[in-house]
Amino acid sequence: MNESNRELILGLSPVHLSLFNSESLLHTFNFFGVGDGQANIASNYVTASKFVIPQPLYSPHGNALNPAFVELIGQAVNTFFAIFMLFQLTRLLLTKKKSHRIYTPTPFSQTLKISLVLLQVILVASLYFLNKNSYFIGGIAATVLALILHLVEFRRSPIAIESLLTYWSANTAFTFAVFIQDSYSKHKIYANSGPAYVIEIISLVNSFLIFVFEVGYYKPGFEITNEKFLDTVNLFSYFTFYYLQPLINKIYATDDVQLTDLPDILGNITCDDTKAKVAKAWEEELKRTKKPGLVSKVWSFVTRRKVNSKPQMFLAIAKAFFDKFAISITLAIIVTGLSFLQPFLLRKFIQFFSTYFYSVEKPPIIIGYFWASVMFLTSVANFIAFNQAFKTQFDLGYEIQSSLTTLIYEKALRLSPQSRKNKPTGDIINHITMDIDIIFWFCWQLGEYLASPLKLAVCLAALYKLFSNATWAGVITAIIVAPLATLVNASMSKNYIQLMKDKDERTSLITEILNSAKSIKFYSWEKPMLARLSHIRNDRELNNIKKIGVVSALAQFLWSCIPFFISCATYATYAYFYNVPLTPDIVFPALALFDLLSEPMLLIPSFIVEVIEVSTSLARIGELLCLDELADDQHGYVKRDPEPNDNSIYSVIVKDATFVWSEETQQKQYTDEESEVQEVPASNVALKNINFSARKGELACIVGKVGSGKSTLIKAILGDVPIKIPSYSDDSTNPTPSVETFGSIAYCPQNPWILNGTVKENILFGHKYDAEFYQKTIDACELISDFKNLPDGDQTVVGEKGISLSGGQKARISLARSVYTRADIYLLDDILSAVDAHVGKNIIKKVLSNEGLIGNRCRILATNSVPVLHEANDIYLIAGGAFVEHGKFKEVMKRNGDLAKLIKEYGRKKDEPTEEETTEASTEPKEEDHSNGKSDTAVHDELDTDELVDEIVDYVGEQNRGVVEQAILRRASVVSYGHNYENDEADNGQIRKTRHEQEESRKGTVPWDIFKQYIIACDYKYFSFYVAATFSVVLISAGEKYLLSYWSQLNSEQNDTVEPVFFLGTYATLGVVSGFLTYMGALVIWSYCIVKGSTYFHNKMAESVLRSPMSFFDTTPIGRILNRFTEDIGKIDMNLPWTIISFITTLLNGFVTFGVILSFLPLMLVVIVSLLFVYNYFRIRFVPTTRELKRLESIAKSPVLATIQESINGVETIKAFHQRERFVYKSKKLIDEKTLIGVVQQNCNRWLSMRLQTISSSIMFFTALLAVVTLGGKHPILPSILGFVMTYSMSITYILNSLVRIWAEMQAGGVAIERIIEYCDLPSEAPMIIEDKRPQDSWPAHGVVKFKKYSTAYRKHLDPVLREIELTINSKEKVGIVGRTGAGKSSLTLALFRIIEATGGNIEIDGVDTSQIGLYDLRHHLTIIPQEAHTFRASVRENLDPFGEYSDDKLWKVLELAHLKEHVTKMETDPTEEEKKASKNPDELSKKVGLDAQIEEGGSNLSSGQKQLLCLARALLNETSKILVLDEATAAVDFQTDKIIQETIRTEFKDKTILTIAHRIDTIMDSDKILVLDSGKVAEFDSPQNLLKNKDSIFYSLAKEGGYID
């Protein structure tokens, strides 16, 4: 035989080895007509040359592989793994051993595995000696290398290394393939003799066992200590997500999961890692925008305008996570390539069947098995890459989520006051809950989006290969239809932007409502608050969702039609212009390609929508991050030294400083053209020309009327009010303004900021527990008696904002926090206003005086209290934002100015010392003050301190006594950020009554009843229509495919395109009907079902929450409630509907798919049923796992929101105490916990996906195998039917995976409904109105109040706060209510308004039992000026009269009576952004003034006193009420304003019954009667005169302690 014939026989042409060339496996013998005899000749040449690639098949018509070809593959495999193992062996040997590594004994599994590997070496060597084949030399070398590597890895690697895992798996698969041929073919590969065959079987089993031991039982020979979890996971476990199996088994067994059960698989997805990346990239982006590029410079030159480039958050994120973006895109491209390989493989498979049916010489059956195997392996490779792509994209999403959440939170803690005003807490919460979630969900499809252009190009190229130029007909159709669909999608942009703003506004309003729940109940304002919320939610937000839904339905119709239009146009053009029949091998691969084409086509609209959403969200976040911060040094004008200045007597110095409300306004200062002097608008000036100093060890007091600037000065010293920057035109001789502080600062705000924690945690506030000084602190702050009354003492959990505490208790806890820090400078803002007079007197003595606990520190006190002024070293009188008088106490009294008159007028009433007495007292030696001015406890403490000083001085010398005395009151040490204070207590194990209530989490499957309630809320009639329409669409789709199958078979049989007009016309008609039904279903589900359901649940939950008793707000963090109104509502608005739609569609598709397969391949029933058992095994484990993880995630998110909201509200306190890092650490810890849950949950999804896609690929594989098997039977499957069936079998992967995933998502969405329904069914207060028990309109006509054996408690398990109260308050009687802290004064108010309900007895008003009438009728007919004055982010008018019942004249009148008219007249606010956009001439919009002026969130543009006066104005409006309750109503105002208010009350409420709870006993001295409460009981009830006559009375002792009697 000549050389050329030899080459032809061996099949050297590389073209013949092409995967897609059908001739590669049909052998070239067919082409030359070579018979079996020649094939035998060929076999003689199989191993004749070592330089040629042998044929894969032994003969063109036989079903056996060529042994030479198999051996060549084996050699290549051995060579590859030998190199791979050698590389890893070298790496392990060069890796330095850890010195601290602890080695363990060798386990039996390791010994057995080594023995098996050694056996494998012997077996391979035996095969070599039996076969004398050089192939086995490579096998021996590879196995020996594996043996060495097994020995080394045991002591060096924590996991089974990759080369060994892959080698043994590949070796097992290869040996199995050889075993199959050796068992069923006469053309042997290894087993040319009986012993060789036995050794082959043993080698196969042995190789498999080694693999099992390596992958499942590997344990390193040392203890794993500091390795990250993922570093202990081997390759197979990582790619199959097997490392989650223990967790899944645990949840399946217990139906429960805790955070501690989760494996720590975060890796680098922690806040610290991710935030650092984004922060760095954002800083670079900010620098980039400050330096315009070439294009910007050219454009600026051409237009003569400055180009302002905004920093782009997207660019910063892209730069920070470039590696993850690149990996995600690469994996998406791989998935795309493998996906497009499937249609070509299907075509090869169908062509094999066609050749088998219509060719004379039938190809070997092994070729069919080959293509079935290749399709299976391609599918496996596809889903492995697919799941890794998903994992990467979700990891990217979580990295962005954690980084942005941390950045936003840290930014919120640094915002300037003006920025905080522009960006309310609700907006910031929305950025975290809404915007970041939108970005996160965009990331998980990012790879798909970015790979879409590639998919489109590859798909068109593939279609061109099938249809040639006819493809362009489809392309032209797409070009015509796609822009229309794109325009429809683009039209949603405006709606989405508005939707996000509506969500912001709704969240802000809900936050305000929750914060002001008690006031809303006092005023019975539930109805107007719900009306405001309903307007934003139903009329605006849901209306936008409805518009988006209608447009989405139209877009869905258009995009679903595009692939159909393309297929129609392509088929029609091909049939008309090309004389080639549309056979199954063209039609069904084309259908698969059209489906693949629909993916990028369908992704385009969602991509456009999501890009709009994401760009909006990123822009909003970027805008937040660009907001102004108030720098600590304020451009160098503020200097802070953390240590006292030993060379100066001053601790605080403010020189020539003017402070402004807004830096923005300051930056927009107008310039007078002539004088060129810049001025700050008067409305922006907060304080002007301030010169102030405070010395070490002295008390400086700042006094003034309400709104004069006392609190502003305190905040200015803190650095929270911007200092006015001198203009360039200022005279250089003018002094430069400055604020200097020397030493650490403690701040006690006027409105105490209390954490939702224990009392002890609030006092220690991140500092180390010092039992001795802690006891001194609580004693000095008068808290010991409170601790005795609180349910758990200082371990009592106080609730959100300290809601379970009285105003006085909150004030004293806040003061104790400041005192405990042992700071150098104390900034105290009106701390005495909320405490009783006798308590205030003790605090002055024990804390504020020079002999007090912080007497040797600098104290700056803004106050309206006159008694404390006697202790002051300096007194400043402030009015209109400027100091008008200043001096020491003696100087002020001698000057006899306004300040002296104030002191004389109000001071003499309280038995305060005269000027002479003060002078005399001030000359007395301090030692006597020590002995006479302190309680026994305090004296004992001081003696201990003196003894300690003496002891230390003995060692260091008398010359250092001063230093020692200063050092004794040392600064408090901080604890670690994660410190648990409960561990500091010896009794931390005892049962607490007020522990933090964990958010309830139900267990088990979400019941069908939950979904039933949702469907009923959505209107089941419309829902049924949608299901029917969807089912029709699925059936029509099956009909379309069968029509094409039937037509293509006719074309094959007749070798011509049969009746194209009829078949394509029918196909087009079915497509149009399907598209129309799709549109109608989408329109109905979005326009009617979803909006209706969302309206129902939000309305019901809002009403249920607002109608809940006050105990619900006491025990439930606001963040937890907000989570229901933001995340959970967001899920039922958008996520859950899509999930339900997808589930119904997928379920119906599944029924049809299995029906089609079983109709033509009945034997598949055995395979499908068997695999469905496996499928169910995974399903029943996955569903509880994802459900419980979702519940855990929902619970984990609430603390994140609660912590962020809580700390944003207390940002001034956090900043003052330098506690930012601690709160950031706490938030990071919570974010990382939430992220871990999310990462585990998504990896569990991948765990399921890997297994279900294996099942799906197996179904496809067995379908193909059974189809090949039918070729040897009586009824072989036709190529057209094969294409029809395989098209459906290839979709099983998607269907099965989607069914479980979507069902799990439905369960997760069901959890959201479950949580909402839980809040829809909260225990409610009594009915607002009881129709048959409504009192008369004139009730109460007299205002007689009777308590009859009345008792009450705040909650069922707590002790009573009022016990058997028995008293009568007559009509028009003025009753003052006093008592020590915790006596029950405020509880009496709550009882009267039925904020808390009776546990015994009742209250009657004018003979009507208040427990028998509706709450609206009760509260609406009572009037209160509450202790906590709440305002809403609305106009002055809406804050006064939310019902709109009164005229403007009436509103102005009550403002005048409340002494607010002047201030409100001057108020002005800019129009909102919405109003500007709605106006044609936004620049011409005037500012809102007077009643229309806006009150900002939390009343930030009003002082505390002004907010109290606003409450007085509200009370003055209610003229019909005959009962007025004043709950410490004038605590926050100065004495002059208090006098005016008291006079207003006497004149305007003279015909009303008045109950006054007051700290200042002088304000109730003119009351008709005094009610003294003690431990919740009536201790005394008589006229003040009679009570003062009795020196044994409690009232007498209170008056004496407060200095009101001689």
From Swiss-Prot:
<feature type="transmembrane region" description="Helical; Name=11">
    <location>
        <begin position="588"/>
        <end position="608"/>
    </location>
</feature>
<feature type="transmembrane region" description="Helical; Name=10">
    <location>
        <begin position="548"/>
        <end position="568"/>
    </location>
</feature>
<dbReference type="GO" id="GO:0009267">
    <property type="term" value="P:cellular response to starvation"/>
</dbReference>
<feature type="binding site">
    <location>
        <begin position="704"/>
        <end position="711"/>
    </location>
    <ligand>
        <name>ATP</name>
    </ligand>
</feature>
<feature type="transmembrane region" description="Helical; Name=8">
    <location>
        <begin position="438"/>
        <end position="458"/>
    </location>
</feature>
<dbReference type="GO" id="GO:1990961">
    <property type="term" value="P:xenobiotic detoxification by transmembrane export across the plasma membrane"/>
</dbReference>
<dbReference type="GO" id="GO:0000329">
    <property type="term" value="C:fungal-type vacuole membrane"/>
</dbReference>
<feature type="domain" description="ABC transporter 2">
    <location>
        <begin position="1345"/>
        <end position="1600"/>
    </location>
</feature>
<dbReference type="GO" id="GO:0005524">
    <property type="term" value="F:ATP binding"/>
</dbReference>
<feature type="transmembrane region" description="Helical; Name=9">
    <location>
        <begin position="470"/>
        <end position="490"/>
    </location>
</feature>
<dbReference type="Pfam" id="PF00664">
    <property type="entry name" value="ABC_membrane"/>
</dbReference>
<dbReference type="GO" id="GO:0042144">
    <property type="term" value="P:vacuole fusion, non-autophagic"/>
</dbReference>
<keyword id="KW-0843">Virulence</keyword>
<feature type="transmembrane region" description="Helical; Name=7">
    <location>
        <begin position="365"/>
        <end position="385"/>
    </location>
</feature>
<feature type="compositionally biased region" description="Basic and acidic residues">
    <location>
        <begin position="923"/>
        <end position="941"/>
    </location>
</feature>
<dbReference type="InterPro" id="IPR003439">
    <property type="entry name" value="ABC_transporter-like_ATP-bd"/>
</dbReference>
<keyword id="KW-0813">Transport</keyword>
<dbReference type="InterPro" id="IPR011527">
    <property type="entry name" value="ABC1_TM_dom"/>
</dbReference>
<dbReference type="Pfam" id="PF00005">
    <property type="entry name" value="ABC_tran"/>
</dbReference>
<dbReference type="GO" id="GO:0016020">
    <property type="term" value="C:membrane"/>
</dbReference>
<feature type="transmembrane region" description="Helical; Name=15">
    <location>
        <begin position="1154"/>
        <end position="1174"/>
    </location>
</feature>
<feature type="domain" description="ABC transmembrane type-1 1">
    <location>
        <begin position="326"/>
        <end position="613"/>
    </location>
</feature>
<feature type="transmembrane region" description="Helical; Name=16">
    <location>
        <begin position="1252"/>
        <end position="1272"/>
    </location>
</feature>
<dbReference type="InterPro" id="IPR044746">
    <property type="entry name" value="ABCC_6TM_D1"/>
</dbReference>
<keyword id="KW-0812">Transmembrane</keyword>
<feature type="transmembrane region" description="Helical; Name=13">
    <location>
        <begin position="1071"/>
        <end position="1091"/>
    </location>
</feature>
<feature type="transmembrane region" description="Helical; Name=2">
    <location>
        <begin position="111"/>
        <end position="131"/>
    </location>
</feature>
<dbReference type="GO" id="GO:0140359">
    <property type="term" value="F:ABC-type transporter activity"/>
</dbReference>
<dbReference type="InterPro" id="IPR036640">
    <property type="entry name" value="ABC1_TM_sf"/>
</dbReference>
<feature type="domain" description="ABC transporter 1">
    <location>
        <begin position="672"/>
        <end position="905"/>
    </location>
</feature>
<keyword id="KW-0067">ATP-binding</keyword>
<feature type="binding site">
    <location>
        <begin position="1379"/>
        <end position="1386"/>
    </location>
    <ligand>
        <name>ATP</name>
    </ligand>
</feature>
<dbReference type="InterPro" id="IPR017871">
    <property type="entry name" value="ABC_transporter-like_CS"/>
</dbReference>
<comment type="function">
    <text>Vacuolar multi-drug resistance ABC transporter that may be involved in the transport of bilirubin and glutathione conjugates. Plays an important role in virulence.</text>
</comment>
<dbReference type="GO" id="GO:0055085">
    <property type="term" value="P:transmembrane transport"/>
</dbReference>
<dbReference type="InterPro" id="IPR003593">
    <property type="entry name" value="AAA+_ATPase"/>
</dbReference>
<dbReference type="GO" id="GO:0005886">
    <property type="term" value="C:plasma membrane"/>
</dbReference>
<keyword id="KW-0472">Membrane</keyword>
<dbReference type="GO" id="GO:0016887">
    <property type="term" value="F:ATP hydrolysis activity"/>
</dbReference>
<dbReference type="GO" id="GO:0036180">
    <property type="term" value="P:filamentous growth of a population of unicellular organisms in response to biotic stimulus"/>
</dbReference>
<feature type="transmembrane region" description="Helical; Name=12">
    <location>
        <begin position="1015"/>
        <end position="1035"/>
    </location>
</feature>
<feature type="transmembrane region" description="Helical; Name=6">
    <location>
        <begin position="325"/>
        <end position="345"/>
    </location>
</feature>
